[in-house]
């Protein structure tokens, strides 16, 4: 429901309350679910009207929504049960036990049995835990206090506990204002209008005639724009307030936490409308979770901690979450079959799959070496032997160890969540961080002398929205560092060497679990207040903790000193073991290793085999010995999709186990050339063709992955000799015929007399918006149906050329504009509700539902040439101008806040990076400027390097990579990739060979793995985004009608969720959509590493060479 509809409900509630329609008020509260009336709820609870209490609650939550809801319903039904027992109504008590309380037996059978046993007592107060139960009135009051705390901590009640501050009779006031406005529109207004009905618009009758025609639907040209325009508001839901942290989520683990120091302040996404009063008022309630995330104890911390950790069951201990709904699965989903075996050369001690690519594996070994493997190609891409980068930064103690030639091994390798960094921990003092942007670009970043003795574990986390690395070691400490090597926290408290760490966040609480070799588990917040937990792990020795992929379930696995292994699931809310998995062998020397997969499976390496469990079943599901050769306690690691499992072998190597999907991913680079010729796409050899190297495949229809494309591998590095399955040759994909890809021409576009100069997909992926050179915007929408259930844009289903019933067009103001010289520009709001555009005249804000102009601003001169919404505030827009300035404009107050000067010619591109906190601008002067978002001061200006003989003019466009660190620069003479943090060009491609025409447009695919590039001769190139190597060429003959000379694409747009779909706008006004065929699934084949030796399209020329 839209925000205005929500506000209307509040106005109706106020009206009903003022008119004393009491039952109607509470019924609307319940049915809308917008406002939970605590006063009404209190009255019903204290009166013991339990049916009314549960009926009212049902409008806001159900028993199994979350653990807070479950606890609320449990407390109510428990009180109802106890009161029946107190009245000696045993039959009623049995009815409540069977009908109301039985649902909780699923989650805690022991507790249900204990409650049942109360029936056998003459007075339930004989039970020790209920001995202090007083009279009914007192018990209800105590319970009500607990319910209030649970309701305030429950995220489902957030923003529903305070009624917005309204003036009395606000709905009547609005109606009166509407009537006054209608009266002003009357052609013959009477001095004392007679208002007889609200069912129709008001008009004044003529003295001797019929009613004057209503003017309400006619354009009102005399009304001025409101001073405080609620920008982008009428159809936009209120953005959620900052999520408040709930203590209950980790009550047992962190009961003594301090809300003030728990985690960073919330990042408040600026509202699209002025902040509603209820969101401001609710922050003032002392019991309501605060706007800044923190730990909020809804009970006394010490009492809560003791209650949670005591071993005896309690009537208050039912907070088990409801079972998660899992997708159907079968044993075939498990990677149990050996797919390949690779030789590392020394004992493998740690492995980790790249988070963005299923077949890239990082391996650490006992010699201190790390290796990056591309599994599909069986390639050892990069190896880095252990080496001290800077001895002067190491402690004297470490230098003394090195002088004794003490061997050093890798204890842990890890990827940062975004895949931009690799962390390596060693058995002596050090950790090393590498910056990673592809196998050919693994750079030394930071070396830290982190601990005295071994660094036993390493993990990445993002406290305070800053990437950090967390380490633990033999010195009994846990430390938190930023990636530059600066230490932020040191956590002391363990009495033994710390074995492992598990950083996590839940309900905006960021924390770290740690385990020591004495079996103690501790939990830490990012503060200096000490550990929140001191608890024993099963086995009381080396234990590792892991969360399921979705972060909702916590597991630990370890071994005792006697060699007994334990795998358990924890009940976080209680600080107790929920499930202990069975069928381990006894007395194995060493520590058992485990991993989780797809929120459903657990895998453990034990007794020379891999055992698998369903998370919901304590018995082994299946096991495999991977065709033999495994050590007694193998290390193992799943890839992100769970279709590959890396397992260490006893012969200094590792095996890859796969399920059917895993085998397909491994064959992605192995398909023989003879088989590739059977695909619908015609592959032709192109001498010296530019290539890409490593495929980050995203299946059609899969969720978009925030990822990077890997560039070419280094041919000089050692490789595995077994290459019989490798492709014998690689050929550039060339699409020459319409049958070789899916394509569609959007309806009502062919033969138009105007050019498509701007093209966008809607953010939902269900529509395309085109801006013509005449200033008119057109919208196409896909609707869900049997052929297209998702309702997303696709080339296989014809969309609707969408227009509102009014027949309005989205037409920009072009009065007095020379359209030949205009630079039309467009920007879409994040929620697809509004589009802002200009075509040489004023900037217009259009409602995407009605096509009505909501407001106009920034009249020329100078004309607007580029528009970009601020990523953190839709009310702030960066507007590039014809006179080379950039205006930072606030729509809400209709004011230019800053004017940026740094270019010499008109602005042609703008892009924001929230990661770097900068705005990047480009102009027709071939200059790129970097501006601080905080101060709007210019940081640097860079000229793009022009090829020899080319003039530095023409439009330059910029777009950030999804990592927000690299930026694509597009000019008719080149594609270039800049490192925005250093403001330096790192890669460049110049039109050449079959793609020698000037570039007309280019854009990243949604996952930034590909770059779609259009050329003025009609060719389209699909490039690998990291290496700028050509993967596929689409000829004009594949998508343009024959005989249309001079027809070419002017602009390209990429689908926001499907990385393999794009659209192009042509100079005849038509819009074409393109997708690879189902059989192919992607644009072009990934070349084997040998193809890297062919001439590259990436320009390695120096700036001086370019200018010669």
UniProtKB/Swiss-Prot annotation:
Q: Does the keyword ATP-binding apply?
A: no
Q: Where is this region: Disordered?
A: 706-725, 1084-1108
Q: Where is the LisH domain?
A: 4-36
Q: Spell out the subcellular localization from the entry.
A: Nucleus
Show the SUPFAM superfamilies listed in the entry. Quinoprotein alcohol dehydrogenase-like
Ranges for domain CTLH come to 34-92
Q: What does this protein do, in the record's words?
A: Transcriptional corepressor. Negative regulator of jasmonate responses.
Domain comment in the entry: The N-terminal TOPLESS domain (TPD) (1-209) binds directly to a 12-amino acid LxLxL EAR motif peptide.
Q: What is this protein called?
A: Topless-related protein 3
The organism named in the record is Arabidopsis thaliana (Mouse-ear cress)
Taxonomic lineage: Eukaryota, Viridiplantae, Streptophyta, Embryophyta, Tracheophyta
């Amino acid at each position: 429901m839209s925000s205005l509809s929500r506000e209307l409900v509040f106005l109706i509630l106020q009206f009903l309350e003022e008119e004393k329609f009491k039952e109607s008020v509470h019924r609307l509260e319940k049915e809308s679910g917008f406002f939970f009336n605590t006063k009404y709820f209190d009255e019903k609870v204290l009166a013991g009207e339990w049916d009314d209490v549960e009926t009212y609650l049902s409008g806001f939550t159900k028993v199994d929504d979350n653990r807070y809801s479950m606890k609320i319903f449990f407390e109510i039904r428990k009180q109802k049960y106890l009161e029946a027992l107190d009245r000696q109504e045993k039959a009623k008590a049995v009815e409540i036990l069977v009908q109301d309380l039985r649902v909780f037996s699923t989650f805690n059978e022991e507790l249900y049995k204990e409650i049942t046993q109360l029936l056998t007592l003459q007075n339930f107060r004989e039970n020790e835990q209920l001995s202090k139960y007083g009279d009914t009135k007192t018990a209800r009051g105590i319970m009500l206090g607990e319910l209030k705390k649970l309701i305030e901590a429950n995220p489902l009640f957030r923003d529903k506990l305070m009624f917005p501050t309204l003036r009395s009779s606000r709905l009547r006031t609005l109606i009166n204002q509407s009537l006054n406005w209608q009266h002003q529109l009357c052609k013959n207004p009477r001095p004392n209008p007679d208002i007889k009905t609200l069912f129709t618009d008001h008009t004044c009758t003529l003295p001797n005639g019929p009613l004057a025609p209503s003017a309400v639907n006619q354009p009102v040209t005399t009304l001025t724009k409101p001073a405080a325009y609620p920008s982008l508001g009428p159809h936009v839901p209120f953005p959620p307030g900052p999520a408040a942290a709930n203590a209950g989520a980790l009550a047992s683990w962190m009961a003594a936490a301090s809300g003030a120091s728990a985690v960073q302040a919330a990042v408040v996404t600026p509202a699209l409308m002025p902040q509603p009063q209820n969101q401001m008022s609710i922050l003032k309630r002392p019991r309501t979770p605060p706007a800044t995330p923190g730990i909020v104890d809804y009970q006394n911390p010490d009492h809560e901690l003791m209650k949670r950790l005591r071993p005896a069951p309690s009537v208050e201990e039912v907070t088990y979450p409801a079972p998660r709904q899992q997708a159907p699965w079968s044993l075939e989903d498990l990677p149990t079959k050996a797919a390949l075996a690779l030789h590392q050369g020394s004992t493998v001690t740690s492995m980790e799959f790249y988070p963005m690519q299923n077949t890239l594996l990082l391996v650490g070994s006992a010699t201190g070496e790390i290796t990056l493997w591309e599994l599909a190609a069986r390639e050892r891409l990069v190896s880095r032997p252990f080496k001290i980068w800077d001895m002067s930064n190491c402690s004297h103690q470490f230098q003394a160890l090195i002088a004794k030639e003490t061997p050093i091994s890798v204890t842990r390798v890890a990827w940062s969540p975004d895949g931009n960094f690799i962390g390596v921990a060693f058995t002596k003092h050090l950790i090393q961080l590498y910056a990673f942007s592809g196998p050919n670009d693994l750079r030394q970043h930071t070396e830290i002398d982190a601990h005295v003795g071994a660094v036993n574990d390493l993990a990445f986390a993002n406290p305070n929205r800053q990437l950090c690395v967390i380490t633990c070691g033999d010195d009994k400490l846990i430390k938190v560092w930023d990636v530059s090597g600066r230490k932020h926290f040191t956590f002391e408290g363990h009495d033994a060497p710390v074995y492992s760490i598990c950083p996590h966040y839940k309900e905006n609480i960021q924390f770290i679990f740690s385990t020591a070799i004495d079996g103690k588990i501790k939990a830490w917040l990012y503060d200096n207040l000490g550990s929140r937990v001191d608890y024993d792990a099963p086995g009381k020795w080396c234990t590792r903790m892991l969360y399921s992929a979705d972060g909702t379930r916590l597991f630990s696995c370890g071994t005792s000193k006697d060699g007994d292994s334990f795998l358990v699931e924890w009940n976080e809310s209680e600080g107790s073991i929920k499930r202990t998995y069975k069928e381990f062998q006894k007395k194995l020397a060493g520590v058992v290793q485990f991993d989780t997969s797809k929120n459903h499976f657990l895998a453990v390496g034990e007794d020379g085999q891999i055992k698998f469990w369903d998370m919901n079943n304590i018995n082994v599901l299946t096991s495999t010995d991977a065709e033999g050769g495994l050590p007694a306690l193998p290390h193992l690691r799943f890839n992100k999709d769970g279709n590959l499992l890396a397992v260490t072998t006893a012969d200094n190597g590792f095996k890859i186990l796969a399920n059917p999907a895993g085998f397909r991913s491994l064959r992605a680079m192995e398909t023989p050339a003879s088989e590739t010729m059977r695909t619908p796409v015609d592959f032709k050899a192109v001498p010296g063709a530019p290539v890409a190297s490593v495929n980050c495949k995203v299946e059609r229809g899969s969720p978009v992955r925030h990822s990077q494309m890997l560039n070419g591998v280094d041919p000089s590095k050692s490789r595995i000799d077994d290459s019989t399955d490798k492709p014998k040759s690689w050929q550039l994909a060339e699409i020459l015929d319409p049958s070789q890809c899916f394509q569609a021409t959007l309806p009502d576009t062919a033969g138009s007399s105007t050019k498509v100069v701007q093209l966008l997909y809607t953010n939902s992926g269900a529509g395309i918006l085109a801006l013509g050179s005449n200033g008119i915007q057109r919208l196409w929408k896909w609707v869900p149906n049997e052929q297209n259930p998702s309702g997303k844009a696709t080339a296989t289903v014809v969309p609707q050329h969408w227009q509102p019933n009014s027949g309005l067009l989205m037409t920009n103001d072009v009065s007095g504009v020379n359209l030949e010289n205009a630079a039309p520009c467009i920007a879409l709001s994040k929620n697809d509700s509004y589009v802002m555009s200009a075509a040489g005249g004023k900037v217009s804000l259009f409602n995407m539902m009605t096509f009505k102009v909501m407001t106009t601003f920034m009249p020329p001169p100078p004309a607007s040439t580029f528009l970009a919404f601020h990523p953190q505030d839709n009310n702030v827009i960066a507007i590039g101008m014809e006179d080379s300035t950039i205006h930072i404009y606030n729509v809400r107050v209709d004011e230019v806040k800053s004017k940026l000067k740094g270019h010499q010619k008109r602005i042609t591109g703008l892009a924001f990076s929230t990661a770097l906190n900068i705005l990047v601008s480009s102009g027709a002067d071939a200059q790129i400027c970097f501006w601080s978002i905080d101060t709007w001061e210019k940081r640097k200006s860079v000229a793009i390097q022009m090829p020899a003989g080319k003039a530095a003019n023409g439009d330059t466009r910029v777009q950030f990579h999804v990592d927000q660190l690299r930026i694509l620069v597009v000019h008719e003479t080149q594609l270039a990739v800049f490192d925005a943090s250093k403001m330096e060009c790192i890669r460049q491609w110049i039109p050449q060979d079959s793609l020698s025409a000037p570039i007309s447009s280019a854009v990243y695919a949604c996952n930034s793995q590909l770059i779609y590039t259009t050329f003025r001769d009609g060719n389209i190139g699909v490039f690998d985004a990291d290496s700028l190597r050509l993967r596929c060429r689409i000829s004009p003959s594949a998508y343009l009608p024959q005989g249309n000379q001079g027809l070419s694409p002017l602009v390209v747009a990429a689908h926001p969720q499907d990385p393999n779909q794009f659209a192009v706008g042509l100079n005849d006004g038509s819009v074409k959509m393109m997708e690879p065929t189902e059989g192919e699934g992607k644009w072009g084949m990934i070349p084997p590493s040998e193809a890297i030796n062919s001439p590259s399209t990436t320009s390695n020329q120096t700036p001086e060479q370019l200018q010669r």
